[in-house]
């Protein structure tokens, strides 16, 4: 019993860190400079809410099994939607062209998993659900629950991979857009994504493989929450400091100028004079759009130049 209480206290720490981060992001939302940053803030708020719900389930799993059985649909739903919303944040930050709406089909699989668990909660008797989670008996309910857990894990891995691929593609294009090497690297986001895969598989594996795994690990669970808390803090601080570069979409006017070829033709001397006078290479926040505006030219032409 003491071990269960200790485990519950350990699992409550990520709930607190997510709540504090949620408050800080919420207070900063009104300061967001543009629509894109506000979208990122709203998505982060959603992620922190889902993380709080997930880790609250781990607390219940440790101290009150009956409560966890009733809470299971919420735990499943939050765990399945977290990777999608993290991918949504990556999708917004790494946008390199026209601002496209996030495809709704990304929410279909998590929604199906949620509906499946909710149907089990309403149809299957409580004791049968309890047995499917905590006993080693074989039944249709336990098979569905185990399969759903595995799909949730695979979903987290899949969207982590998609996020990393999108960051890789973004890095290739942002090099010609901004001189801010630190902010455009997104190393912090890649680290969070990779770290989270390892973090989430450990506690979920305890549920999939059986409660005995929790007992065998014992006090080592105290160390599994450290990456979670660290992830919450790193994500919060980087969003608050806007440690990323948003590539602005090409405006209609720029498209018109590019199509007509009606922009200033840049000569070597003119560019060298601009670099000598403005010294943009000393400004870490310099963007190619700034140079295009100053030279009355087009960003595509300047990139090629």
Identify what each model region corresponds to.
Residues 21, 82, 157-171:
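Membrane-water interface of transmembrane alpha-helices
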Residues 237-305:
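Membrane-proximal linker segments that couple transmembrane helices to downstream signaling/catalytic modules
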Residues 193-250:
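Interfacial "cap-and-anchor" motif at the non-cytosolic start of specific transmembrane alpha-helices
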Residues 1-119, 137:
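N-terminal low-complexity or simple alpha-helical regulatory segments
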Residues 3-14, 120-126, 134-165, 218-221:
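Extracellular-loop-to-transmembrane junctions of the mid-late helices
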Residues 94-123, 140-149, 180-196:
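The cytoplasmic-loop to transmembrane-helix boundary for the fourth helix
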Residues 30-31, 91-98, 165-181:
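Cytoplasmic membrane-interface regions of multi-pass membrane proteins
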Residues 28-30, 56-67, 121-132, 204-215:
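Juxtamembrane "helix-exit" motif on the non-cytosolic side of transmembrane helices
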């Amino acid at each position: 019993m003491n071990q269960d209480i200790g485990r519950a206290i350990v699992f409550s720490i990520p709930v607190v860190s997510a709540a504090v981060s949620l408050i800080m992001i919420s207070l900063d939302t009104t300061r967001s400079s543009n629509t894109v940053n506000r979208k990122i803030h709203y998505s982060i708020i959603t992620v922190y809410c889902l993380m709080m719900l997930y880790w609250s389930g781990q607390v219940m799993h440790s101290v009150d099994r009956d409560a966890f059985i009733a809470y299971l649909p919420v735990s499943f739903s939050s765990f399945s939607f977290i990777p999608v919303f993290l991918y949504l944040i990556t999708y917004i930050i790494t946008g390199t062209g026209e601002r496209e709406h996030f495809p709704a089909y990304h929410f279909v699989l998590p929604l199906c998993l949620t509906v499946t668990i909710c149907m089990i909660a309403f149809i299957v008797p409580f004791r049968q659900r309890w047995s499917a989670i905590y006993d080693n008996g074989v039944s249709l309910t336990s098979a569905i629950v185990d399969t759903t857990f595995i799909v949730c894990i695979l979903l987290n891995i899949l969207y982590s991979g998609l996020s990393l691929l999108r960051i890789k593609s973004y890095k290739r294009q942002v090099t010609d857009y901004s001189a801010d090497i630190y902010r455009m690297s997104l190393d912090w986001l890649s680290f969070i994504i990779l770290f989270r895969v390892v973090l989430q598989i450990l506690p979920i594996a305890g549920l999939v493989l059986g409660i005995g795994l929790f007992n065998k690990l014992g006090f080592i669970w105290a160390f599994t929450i450290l990456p979670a808390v660290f992830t919450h803090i790193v994500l919060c601080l980087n969003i608050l400091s806007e440690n990323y570069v948003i590539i602005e979409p090409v405006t209609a006017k720029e498209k018109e100028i590019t199509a007509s070829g009606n922009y200033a033709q840049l000569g070597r001397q003119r560019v060298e004079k601009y670099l000598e006078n403005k010294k943009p290479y000393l400004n870490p926040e310099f963007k190619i759009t700034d140079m295009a505006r100053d030279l009355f030219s087009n960003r595509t032409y300047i990139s090629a130049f």
